[in-house]
UniProtKB/Swiss-Prot annotation:
Protein name, as recorded: Tryptophan synthase alpha chain
SUPFAM superfamilies: Ribulose-phoshate binding barrel
Keywords annotated in UniProt: Amino-acid biosynthesis, Aromatic amino acid biosynthesis, Lyase, Tryptophan biosynthesis
The protein's Enzyme Commission number: 4.2.1.20
UniProt-listed NCBIfam families: trpA
Pathway: Amino-acid biosynthesis; L-tryptophan biosynthesis; L-tryptophan from chorismate: step 5/5
Function description: The alpha subunit is responsible for the aldol cleavage of indoleglycerol phosphate to indole and glyceraldehyde 3-phosphate.
Gene Ontology CC, one term: cytosol
Length: 256
């Protein structure tokens, strides 16, 4: 049982995303630790990429800044190695496929050695993912797969068969970014998905406040907040303020 599975046995998942290298690797380490201190219990560490088609403007701009500072996939793994000296909470590497492809087959074992627990490749459909899935499982890294509102039952069966750790439900079409409410069809979609899988389901793409997080947890096993944190980091939020922000968004934390 890996750290992701252990976490879901303890409590619902509060997942935070940040783009590694935005503001420098030291700043990223500081931010990861601040988020963990604020109650985040799973971290998604984003590998900056030059064509992040699934991401909205906030995360696209973070990728541009991180790449401008020379951040590479190996730098991201060094960051995770440093984080592992301080914390054992699960880490999911959030990436596009090209950086993995460019790094070669050894990258999966390097990911495992750095302390990565799961890998989510945002632009790799399950139908084309066989080599990636095999490499993940050989390295004992959970392949985290995506579901969307348009995922068919047949495709969901395939995703359920190959995914591990958890499934990530993208609760609305389009790119990442802050939204005001969850989609109206969210409860029905979640119930449909849950009837077809025993894996925990987290949901994201737009959750931006405590109320939305609480609503998500009525149906999902966890929620993801990304753009809000990325924007705050870009604006120079202090590590203590980032911890307080994370606490303020957590439905299980006492009201701020």
């Amino acid at each position: 049982m890996n750290r992701i599975e252990q976490q879901f046995k303890k409590s619902p998942a509060y997942v935070a995303y940040l783009t590694a290298g935005d503001g420098g690797l030291e700043r990223s380490l500081e931010s990861l630790l601040a988020l963990a201190k604020g109650g985040v219990n799973i971290l998604e560490v984003g590998v900056p990429f030059s064509d992040p088609v699934a991401d909205g403007p906030v995360i696209q701009e973070a990728s541009i800044r991180a790449l401008a500072q020379g951040t590479t996939l190996h730098d991201v793994l060094t960051l995770i190695t440093s984080f592992r000296q301080h914390s054992e909470i699960p880490i999911i590497l959030f990436t596009y496929f090209n950086p993995l492809l460019a790094a070669g087959d050894k990258i999966y074992q390097q990911m495992k050695s750095a302390g990565v627990d799961g890998c989510l490749v945002v632009d790799l459909p399950v139908e084309e993912a066989a080599p990636h899935l095999t490499a993940c499982k050989t390295a004992k890294i959970a392949p985290i797969l995506l579901i969307s509102p348009s995922t068919t039952q047949e495709r969901l069966k395939k995703i359920n068969e190959h995914g591990e750790g958890m499934l990530y439900y993208v609760c609305r079409p389009g790119t990442t970014g802050v939204r005001a409410t969850l989609p109206e069809n969210f409860p029905a979609k979640m119930n449909q998905i849950k009837s077809m899988t025993s894996l925990p389901i987290v949901t994201g793409f737009g959750i931006a406040n405590r109320k939305m997080a609480a609503q998500a947890l009525q149906y999902a096993d966890g929620f993801v907040i990304g753009s809000l944190f990325v924007k705050a980091i870009a604006e120079g939020i202090s590590k203590n303020a980032l911890t307080r922000l994370a606490q303020s968004l957590n439905p299980h934390y006492p009201n701020p």
